[in-house]
Amino acid sequence: MMNIIKIDNTQSGIFLERINKYLAKIYLNENVVDVHVHDPGRLKELLFKNNKVLVKKVNSTNRKTKYDLIAAKKEKEYVLVHSMYHRYIAEKILRKKYTHLKAEVKYKNSRIDFLAEDKFWIEIKGCTLSDGNMARFPDAPTKRGTKHLEDLMELKKQGFDTFIYFLIFANANYFSPNYETDLSFSKKLEEAYSLGVKIVPLLFSLENNWIVFKREIQLIFDG
Protein backbone atom coordinates (compact mmCIF):
# COMPACT_ATOMS: atom_id res chain seq x y z
CA MET A 1 0.00 0.00 0.00
CA MET A 2 1.12 3.54 -0.75
CA ASN A 3 -0.35 6.95 0.02
CA ILE A 4 -0.76 8.89 -3.23
CA ILE A 5 -2.57 12.20 -2.69
CA LYS A 6 -4.27 13.78 0.31
CA ILE A 7 -7.55 15.62 -0.27
CA ASP A 8 -7.92 18.04 2.61
CA ASN A 9 -10.92 20.00 3.86
CA THR A 10 -13.70 17.74 2.61
CA GLN A 11 -17.21 18.09 4.03
CA SER A 12 -19.97 15.48 4.35
CA GLY A 13 -23.28 16.01 2.59
CA ILE A 14 -26.35 14.16 1.37
CA PHE A 15 -26.89 13.66 -2.37
CA LEU A 16 -30.24 14.89 -3.68
CA GLU A 17 -30.26 14.80 -7.49
CA ARG A 18 -28.12 15.04 -10.59
CA ILE A 19 -29.24 17.89 -12.82
CA ASN A 20 -26.97 17.03 -15.76
CA LYS A 21 -23.56 15.45 -16.42
CA TYR A 22 -21.68 18.14 -14.56
CA LEU A 23 -24.15 19.51 -12.01
CA ALA A 24 -25.82 18.01 -8.95
CA LYS A 25 -27.66 19.20 -5.85
CA ILE A 26 -26.76 18.09 -2.35
CA TYR A 27 -27.84 18.89 1.20
CA LEU A 28 -24.93 20.51 3.05
CA ASN A 29 -24.95 22.30 6.40
CA GLU A 30 -28.75 22.57 6.39
CA ASN A 31 -28.78 24.10 2.89
CA VAL A 32 -29.36 22.80 -0.63
CA VAL A 33 -26.27 23.65 -2.72
CA ASP A 34 -25.10 23.04 -6.27
CA VAL A 35 -21.92 21.01 -6.76
CA HIS A 36 -19.77 20.37 -9.80
CA VAL A 37 -19.48 16.74 -10.95
CA HIS A 38 -16.17 16.19 -12.75
CA ASP A 39 -16.91 12.60 -13.79
CA PRO A 40 -19.38 12.55 -16.73
CA GLY A 41 -20.09 8.82 -16.25
CA ARG A 42 -23.53 7.64 -15.17
CA LEU A 43 -22.47 6.75 -11.59
CA LYS A 44 -26.00 5.50 -10.86
CA GLU A 45 -24.79 3.06 -8.22
CA LEU A 46 -23.19 5.98 -6.34
CA LEU A 47 -25.17 9.14 -7.06
CA PHE A 48 -28.66 8.38 -5.81
CA LYS A 49 -30.97 10.29 -3.49
CA ASN A 50 -29.95 10.34 0.19
CA ASN A 51 -26.57 8.72 -0.36
CA LYS A 52 -23.68 10.20 1.62
CA VAL A 53 -21.11 12.21 -0.34
CA LEU A 54 -17.94 14.19 0.27
CA VAL A 55 -17.45 17.64 -1.25
CA LYS A 56 -14.70 20.24 -1.22
CA LYS A 57 -15.11 24.01 -1.38
CA VAL A 58 -13.40 25.65 -4.34
CA ASN A 59 -12.06 29.18 -4.03
CA SER A 60 -12.80 30.58 -7.48
CA THR A 61 -14.76 33.60 -8.65
CA ASN A 62 -15.10 32.24 -12.19
CA ARG A 63 -17.42 29.36 -11.33
CA LYS A 64 -21.15 29.07 -10.79
CA THR A 65 -20.68 26.28 -8.24
CA LYS A 66 -18.69 26.70 -5.03
CA TYR A 67 -18.14 22.99 -4.40
CA ASP A 68 -16.63 19.97 -6.16
CA LEU A 69 -18.07 16.51 -5.64
CA ILE A 70 -15.18 14.36 -4.38
CA ALA A 71 -16.57 10.95 -3.38
CA ALA A 72 -19.74 8.97 -2.74
CA LYS A 73 -20.45 6.27 -0.15
CA LYS A 74 -20.66 2.63 -1.15
CA GLU A 75 -21.19 0.18 1.69
CA LYS A 76 -18.43 0.98 4.23
CA GLU A 77 -16.16 3.06 2.00
CA TYR A 78 -16.13 6.22 -0.07
CA VAL A 79 -15.50 5.93 -3.81
CA LEU A 80 -13.61 8.74 -5.57
CA VAL A 81 -15.77 10.35 -8.29
CA HIS A 82 -13.56 13.34 -9.12
CA SER A 83 -11.86 12.50 -12.41
CA MET A 84 -9.47 15.47 -12.26
CA TYR A 85 -7.37 13.45 -9.79
CA HIS A 86 -6.81 10.59 -12.24
CA ARG A 87 -3.85 12.19 -13.96
CA TYR A 88 -2.13 13.06 -10.66
CA ILE A 89 -2.67 9.54 -9.34
CA ALA A 90 -1.37 7.94 -12.52
CA GLU A 91 1.66 10.21 -12.66
CA LYS A 92 2.60 9.37 -9.07
CA ILE A 93 2.41 5.64 -9.88
CA LEU A 94 4.26 5.93 -13.19
CA ARG A 95 7.10 8.02 -11.78
CA LYS A 96 7.96 5.10 -9.52
CA LYS A 97 8.75 3.16 -12.70
CA TYR A 98 9.81 5.72 -15.31
CA THR A 99 12.22 8.67 -15.20
CA HIS A 100 11.09 10.56 -18.30
CA LEU A 101 7.35 11.14 -18.60
CA LYS A 102 5.41 13.35 -21.04
CA ALA A 103 1.70 14.04 -20.53
CA GLU A 104 -1.06 14.57 -23.11
CA VAL A 105 1.03 13.50 -26.11
CA LYS A 106 -0.52 14.02 -29.53
CA TYR A 107 -0.91 11.00 -31.80
CA LYS A 108 -2.72 11.67 -35.08
CA ASN A 109 -6.13 13.07 -34.07
CA SER A 110 -5.90 11.84 -30.48
CA ARG A 111 -4.00 12.60 -27.32
CA ILE A 112 -2.54 9.73 -25.33
CA ASP A 113 -2.27 10.38 -21.59
CA PHE A 114 1.43 9.60 -21.19
CA LEU A 115 4.55 8.75 -23.17
CA ALA A 116 7.27 7.26 -20.94
CA GLU A 117 10.95 7.15 -21.91
CA ASP A 118 9.86 8.18 -25.44
CA LYS A 119 8.77 4.61 -26.18
CA PHE A 120 6.00 3.46 -23.81
CA TRP A 121 2.53 4.79 -24.68
CA ILE A 122 0.12 4.77 -21.72
CA GLU A 123 -3.60 5.53 -21.55
CA ILE A 124 -5.42 6.04 -18.22
CA LYS A 125 -9.07 5.26 -17.40
CA GLY A 126 -10.87 5.72 -14.09
CA CYS A 127 -13.27 3.02 -12.90
CA THR A 128 -15.93 3.57 -10.21
CA LEU A 129 -18.28 0.67 -10.99
CA SER A 130 -18.10 -2.64 -9.14
CA ASP A 131 -20.49 -5.57 -9.04
CA GLY A 132 -19.68 -7.79 -6.09
CA ASN A 133 -15.96 -8.53 -6.40
CA MET A 134 -15.82 -7.47 -10.07
CA ALA A 135 -14.87 -3.95 -11.17
CA ARG A 136 -16.18 -3.02 -14.60
CA PHE A 137 -15.46 -0.32 -17.17
CA PRO A 138 -17.13 1.62 -18.66
CA ASP A 139 -20.34 2.58 -16.83
CA ALA A 140 -21.57 4.37 -19.99
CA PRO A 141 -20.78 3.80 -23.70
CA THR A 142 -17.43 5.36 -24.62
CA LYS A 143 -16.56 5.91 -28.27
CA ARG A 144 -13.56 7.93 -27.10
CA GLY A 145 -12.32 4.98 -25.05
CA THR A 146 -12.66 2.67 -28.05
CA LYS A 147 -10.72 5.14 -30.20
CA HIS A 148 -7.92 5.22 -27.62
CA LEU A 149 -7.71 1.41 -27.78
CA GLU A 150 -7.45 1.57 -31.57
CA ASP A 151 -4.62 4.10 -31.23
CA LEU A 152 -2.75 1.86 -28.77
CA MET A 153 -3.18 -1.13 -31.09
CA GLU A 154 -1.84 0.85 -34.02
CA LEU A 155 1.17 1.97 -31.99
CA LYS A 156 1.74 -1.62 -30.87
CA LYS A 157 1.84 -2.73 -34.50
CA GLN A 158 4.50 -0.07 -35.09
CA GLY A 159 6.69 -1.73 -32.45
CA PHE A 160 5.96 0.39 -29.37
CA ASP A 161 5.02 -1.01 -25.97
CA THR A 162 1.51 0.16 -25.13
CA PHE A 163 -0.48 0.09 -21.89
CA ILE A 164 -3.93 0.92 -20.61
CA TYR A 165 -4.16 1.48 -16.86
CA PHE A 166 -7.53 1.21 -15.13
CA LEU A 167 -7.59 3.15 -11.85
CA ILE A 168 -10.22 1.32 -9.80
CA PHE A 169 -11.79 3.20 -6.90
CA ALA A 170 -14.53 0.75 -5.86
CA ASN A 171 -13.45 -2.29 -3.86
CA ALA A 172 -12.96 -5.38 -6.04
CA ASN A 173 -10.71 -8.40 -6.55
CA TYR A 174 -11.15 -8.70 -10.32
CA PHE A 175 -11.57 -6.43 -13.34
CA SER A 176 -13.53 -7.05 -16.53
CA PRO A 177 -14.80 -4.85 -19.35
CA ASN A 178 -18.50 -4.03 -19.08
CA TYR A 179 -19.94 -6.08 -21.95
CA GLU A 180 -23.53 -5.22 -21.09
CA THR A 181 -22.97 -1.45 -21.21
CA ASP A 182 -20.50 -1.18 -24.10
CA LEU A 183 -19.95 -4.33 -26.14
CA SER A 184 -17.87 -2.48 -28.75
CA PHE A 185 -15.33 -1.25 -26.18
CA SER A 186 -15.27 -4.64 -24.44
CA LYS A 187 -14.53 -6.58 -27.62
CA LYS A 188 -11.93 -4.01 -28.63
CA LEU A 189 -10.23 -4.45 -25.24
CA GLU A 190 -10.11 -8.21 -25.85
CA GLU A 191 -8.62 -7.56 -29.28
CA ALA A 192 -6.04 -5.16 -27.86
CA TYR A 193 -5.06 -7.69 -25.19
CA SER A 194 -4.61 -10.41 -27.82
CA LEU A 195 -2.40 -8.07 -29.82
CA GLY A 196 -0.15 -7.44 -26.81
CA VAL A 197 -1.46 -4.17 -25.37
CA LYS A 198 -0.82 -4.51 -21.63
CA ILE A 199 -3.88 -4.04 -19.40
CA VAL A 200 -3.10 -2.94 -15.84
CA PRO A 201 -6.01 -2.80 -13.33
CA LEU A 202 -4.90 -1.01 -10.14
CA LEU A 203 -7.01 -0.84 -6.98
CA PHE A 204 -7.22 2.31 -4.85
CA SER A 205 -9.16 3.36 -1.78
CA LEU A 206 -9.99 6.62 -0.03
CA GLU A 207 -8.84 6.41 3.60
CA ASN A 208 -8.59 9.30 6.07
CA ASN A 209 -8.60 11.79 3.17
CA TRP A 210 -5.77 9.93 1.43
CA ILE A 211 -6.06 8.23 -1.95
CA VAL A 212 -4.22 4.98 -1.26
CA PHE A 213 -2.79 2.56 -3.83
CA LYS A 214 -3.52 -0.99 -2.65
CA ARG A 215 -2.56 -3.50 -5.34
CA GLU A 216 -2.95 -4.70 -8.92
CA ILE A 217 -5.99 -6.94 -9.34
CA GLN A 218 -6.71 -9.79 -11.74
CA LEU A 219 -7.98 -9.20 -15.28
CA ILE A 220 -10.85 -11.43 -16.42
CA PHE A 221 -12.78 -11.40 -19.70
CA ASP A 222 -16.18 -12.74 -18.65
CA GLY A 223 -18.37 -11.64 -21.57
Swiss-Prot record:
Name of one Pfam family that matches: SfsA_N
Q: Which domain of life is it from?
A: Bacteria
Give the protein's recorded name.
Answer: Sugar fermentation stimulation protein homolog
Q: Name one GO molecular function term.
A: DNA binding
Query: Family per UniProt?
Result: Belongs to the SfsA family.
Q: Which organism is it from?
A: Thermosipho melanesiensis (strain DSM 12029 / CIP 104789 / BI429)
Q: Where is the signal peptide?
A: none
Gene name in the database record: sfsA
